[in-house]
């Protein structure tokens, strides 16, 4: 009897061990996603997130710029983001696209340009070290803005010259063959090409003493946004502005963009949406987000903020976080 039992017991043990050995790979494989996710969480918890100040769209690519020369790019409508090579360690304030070129401007007179969709950057030739806060493209020229003068490049960012002086604008937009800038104490500047500037001549040219941080062009109108939720529009290329009703609860607005037949303005815990003809008062859609800049492309609004936060929306109402802390 014992001789018969031994082979049976041995066969049972061998079979059990074989089953366990065969499952080792399966067990290890099942643990890998958990370990991978844990590693990703740990990396995200310890990595440094930089503030993003500006964003634009061109050549089916979103490019965002910010603190310490940070560059982030997306070619899938904002779903995923890659790191561009930093062309500087200076703060980058704003970015624009035109003629197959991205141009970013910032502190200490920084003027950078990229011709490969934000992957690599070169320094434009510029001698001054004033802070440049905005940039726009139009009439085959890039125009940068500072608190005292404009800068201008006609060779896609390679070389820059000083434009008109005495301006006090923070941002600029191009439309109807005009550059219109907005800035301190309701200041508005109009220029054909950045070399010469004029102040609006209309009786409604200066409607506020509020600081106008952002401006955009859409549906044949310029829209400015600023401190304390200020919004104003012009349909005559900047000569006369009309103040809009400030939405209840709106705070400082820093940027605005046009797309999908609406204007979207973003700022300090404020997202404001207006229809394209301003037949109704602007509406505060969200008061939990703080964004520094917003742009539109491929049917999507993309907004950026501190700690590298990036959100997307199609209507300015519902926002999805796609990147950041």
Q: Which residue stretches match the model-derived regions?
A:
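Short, conserved catalytic or interaction motifs in soluble domains
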Residues: 19
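C-terminal motif of bacterial Sec signal peptides marking the signal peptidase cleavage site
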Residues: 15-16
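Bacterial N-terminal signal peptides that target proteins for export
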Residues: 1-6
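Residue-level hotspots at or immediately adjacent to binding/recognition sites across diverse folds
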Residues: 29-325
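Flanking scaffold residues of small Cys/His-coordinated metal-binding clusters
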Residues: 9
């Amino acid at each position: 009897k014992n001789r018969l039992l031994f082979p049976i017991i041995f066969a049972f043990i061998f079979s059990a061990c074989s089953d366990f050995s065969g499952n080792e790979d399966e067990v290890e494989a099942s643990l890998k996603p958990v370990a991978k996710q844990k590693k990703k969480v740990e990396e995200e918890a310890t990595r440094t997130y930089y503030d993003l100040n500006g964003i634009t769209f061109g050549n089916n690519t979103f490019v965002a710029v910010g603190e310490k020369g940070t560059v982030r790019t997306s070619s899938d409508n904002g779903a995923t983001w890659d790191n561009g090579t930093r062309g500087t360690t200076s703060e980058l304030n704003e970015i624009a696209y035109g003629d197959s070129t991205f141009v970013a401007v910032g502190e200490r007179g920084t003027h950078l340009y990229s011709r490969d969709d934000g992957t690599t950057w070169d320094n434009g030739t510029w001698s001054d070290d004033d802070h440049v806060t905005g940039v726009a493209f139009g009439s085959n020229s890039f125009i940068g803005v500072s608190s005292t003068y404009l800068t201008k490049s006609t060779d896609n960012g390679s070389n820059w010259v000083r434009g008109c002086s005495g301006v006090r604008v923070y941002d600029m937009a191009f439309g109807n063959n005009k550059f219109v800038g907005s800035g301190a104490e309701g200041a508005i500047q109009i220029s054909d090409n950045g070399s010469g500037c004029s102040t609006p001549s209309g009786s409604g040219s200066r409607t506020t003493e509020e600081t106008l941080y952002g401006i955009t062009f859409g549906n044949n109108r310029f829209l400015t946004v600023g401190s304390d939720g200020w919004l104003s529009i012009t349909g005559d290329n900047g000569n006369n502005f009309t103040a809009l009703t400030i939405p209840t609860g709106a705070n400082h607005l820093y940027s605005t963009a046009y797309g999908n037949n609406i204007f979207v303005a973003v700022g300090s815990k404020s997202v404001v949406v207006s229809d394209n003809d301003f037949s109704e008062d602007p509406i505060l859609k969200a008061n939990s987000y703080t964004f520094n800049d917003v742009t539109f492309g491929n049917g999507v609004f993309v907004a950026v903020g501190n700690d590298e936060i990036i959100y997307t929306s199609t209507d300015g109402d519902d926002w999805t976080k796609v990147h950041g802390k």
